[in-house]
UniProtKB/Swiss-Prot annotation:
One of its GO terms (molecular function) is RNA binding. One of its GO terms (biological process) is symbiont-mediated suppression of host cytoplasmic pattern recognition receptor signaling pathway via inhibition of RIG-I activity. Keywords: Eukaryotic host gene expression shutoff by virus, Host cytoplasm, Host gene expression shutoff by virus, Host mRNA suppression by virus, Host nucleus, Host-virus interaction, Inhibition of host innate immune response by virus, Inhibition of host interferon signaling pathway by virus, Inhibition of host PKR by virus, Inhibition of host pre-mRNA processing by virus, Inhibition of host RIG-I by virus, Inhibition of host RLR pathway by virus, Interferon antiviral system evasion, RNA-binding, Ubl conjugation, Viral immunoevasion. A motif (Nuclear export signal) lies at residues 137-146. Residues 1-73 are annotated as: RNA-binding and homodimerization. The dsRNA-binding region is required for suppression of RNA silencing. The keyword Transport does not apply. It comes from Influenza A virus (strain A/Anas acuta/Primorje/695/1976 H2N3). This is Non-structural protein 1.
């Protein structure tokens, strides 16, 4: 196993522990708490994949971080912070919408890279909007936290989420996953539109209805892809 992979996991575990202590003092805002919860799932998945104990890794990560801080001067820290581009966290959904449980009458699921696409194909003839919470850097989607499809009544009928055991995805990965979700939902004559935030940062091009133009052949192909890979 690559030593950098192990040490990266150890540092991530310790930094999560620090953030958890911060949250326990009721100091974190909603985006902070949301990332904390999702990063916990990611660490569990990575720990299982690597065969590493999280508690042991956290202690090792603490030693690594302490060593770095001992060697770090205040001036070097200022220069590092100044050179790192700042990302923004954008929210279409409330914390309640993100954490709400939902179920599917006719579940369909597809794994695309490090993203999991889920939808209820029992939903027909509905107006649906896609909403997401994600971070943006250089005016492009950086990391998808969660995307969900909502009916006008507020019911959740679809979802795109990162797989905890496979961290890392690009804006193109997210764009392709959204296309698959839209294709599957439109297969049952649902009308799907995308939130303005997603249009701006994930799609870059859309029609007047607020969704990307998908040719009928592409929609049918996407829907068949989901059915064949479940």
């Amino acid at each position: 196993m690559d030593s950098n992979t192990v040490s990266s996991f150890q540092v991530d575990c310790f930094l999560w522990h620090v953030r958890k202590r911060f949250a326990d003092q009721e100091l974190g805002d909603a985006p902070f708490l949301d990332r904390l919860r999702r990063d916990q799932k990611s660490l569990r998945g990575r720990g299982s994949t690597l065969g590493l104990d999280i508690e042991t890794a956290t202690r090792a990560g603490k030693q690594i971080v302490e060593r770095i801080l001992e060697e770090e001067s205040d001036e070097a820290l200022k220069m590092t912070i100044a050179s790192v581009p700042a990302s923004r966290y954008l929210t279409d959904m409330t914390l309640e919408e993100m954490s709400r449980d939902w179920f599917m009458l006719m579940p369909k699921q597809k794994v695309a890279g490090s993203l999991c696409i889920r939808m209820d194909q029992a939903i027909m003839d509905k107006n649906i909007i896609l909403k997401a919470n994600f971070s943006v850097i250089f005016d492009r989607l950086e990391t998808l936290i969660l995307l969900r499809a909502f009916t006008e009544e507020g019911a959740i009928v679809g979802e795109i989420s990162p797989l905890p055991s496979l961290p890392g995805h690009t804006d193109e990965d997210v764009k392709n996953a959204i296309g698959v979700l839209i294709g599957g939902l439109e297969w049952n004559d649902n009308t799907v539109r995308v939130s303005e935030t997603l249009q701006r940062f994930a799609w870059r091009s859309s029609n007047e209805d607020g969704r990307p133009p998908l040719p009928p052949k592409q929609k049918r192909k996407m829907a068949r892809t989901i059915e064949s890979e479940v």
